[in-house]
């Protein structure tokens, strides 16, 4: 249809501007002019429509005019209505508020954290106070001086005392040992374990350190209310602390029971081991 219109228009132009036969080049030139003229006209028309559409939309946004849903429109009005759809969608968005029934306990709360930290600090302060009272409490416990035979004595000590201090108090209960001032010459042996001097008795209490026969130091069983109670205690000998001179240990470490003694290692689990026994070791467990 377009081709027929172009031919008629070309024929009309050639008839008005020429006479007789027309060369092919003249025909093509006239046709090209017509096509260019139409393209320019179409481009101009499109630009005008776009400008009108933008102006109308801008005016509508500024004035806040809403398009009626029931209105019928045609042509450009319909296009403008379609262009307005995103705007109407924005208007329909609902405001999202807080839900008062939602659980927010898991969310960070500065005030709650401050209260909890204060409670923890108070609990820790109370616990430290209780532990200090335990450390300061004086207890009476039995001990054995071992030099091949076993002699039972008793001594007052506190859990906060170091093993070295504990040995010094034990030594003071035995007259012929008082003159020895060098504490490195004495060992504390508990359940076949040589306890280093730097450890506190409280360490074994609070950590419930296990030996080969249960608690390494069972202070609840060791504690006595009086010296008379110490004399009648029925605790197994291996559960009672032993004061031993280092010279005796070095001379007899190849024989029972010294051969089984070893230095205590806090990283080791002694509950997995068994206490050494020897039917010929009666002297080691015989009270005097």
Curated annotation (Swiss-Prot):
Q: Indicate where this protein resides in the cell.
A: Nucleus
Q: List the disulfide bonds.
A: none
The signal peptide here is none
Taxonomically, which superkingdom? Eukaryota
GO biological process entries:
chromatin organization; mRNA cis splicing, via spliceosome
Mind telling me which GO cellular component terms the entry cites? Answer: chromatin; nucleus
Q: Which UniProt keywords apply?
A: Nucleus
Identify its protein family. Answer: Belongs to the FAM50 family.
Name used for this protein in its record? FAM50 family protein C1020.12c
Species lineage:
Eukaryota, Fungi, Dikarya, Ascomycota, Taphrinomycotina
């Amino acid at each position: 249809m377009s081709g027929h219109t172009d031919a008629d228009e070309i024929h009309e132009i050639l008839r008005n501007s020429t006479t007789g036969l027309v060369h092919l080049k003249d025909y093509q030139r006239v046709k090209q002019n017509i096509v260019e003229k139409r393209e320019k006209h179409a481009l101009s028309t499109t630009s005008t429509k776009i400008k009108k559409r933008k102006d109308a939309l801008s005016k509508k946004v500024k004035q806040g005019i809403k398009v009626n849903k029931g209105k019928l429109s045609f042509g450009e009005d319909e296009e403008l209505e379609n262009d307005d759809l995103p705007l109407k969608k924005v208007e329909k968005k609902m405001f999202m508020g807080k839900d008062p029934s939602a659980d927010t306990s898991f969310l960070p709360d500065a005030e709650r954290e401050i209260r909890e930290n204060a409670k923890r600090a108070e609990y820790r302060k109370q616990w430290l106070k209780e532990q200090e009272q335990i450390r300061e409490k004086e207890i009476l416990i039995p001990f054995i001086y071992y030099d091949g035979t076993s002699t039972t004595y008793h001594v007052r000590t506190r859990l906060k005392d170091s093993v070295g201090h504990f040995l010094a108090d034990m030594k003071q209960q035995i007259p012929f040992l008082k003159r020895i001032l060098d504490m490195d010459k004495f060992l504390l042996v508990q359940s076949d374990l040589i306890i280093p001097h730097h450890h506190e008795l409280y360490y074994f209490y609070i950590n419930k350190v296990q030996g080969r026969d249960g608690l390494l130091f069972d202070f609840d069983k060791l504690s006595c209310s009086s010296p008379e109670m110490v004399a009648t205690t029925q605790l197994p000998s291996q559960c009672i602390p032993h004061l031993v001179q280092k010279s005796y240990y070095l001379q007899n470490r190849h024989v029972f029971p010294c051969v089984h003694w070893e230095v205590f290692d806090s990283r080791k689990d002694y509950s997995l081991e068994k206490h050494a026994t020897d039917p010929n070791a009666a002297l080691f467990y015989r009270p005097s």
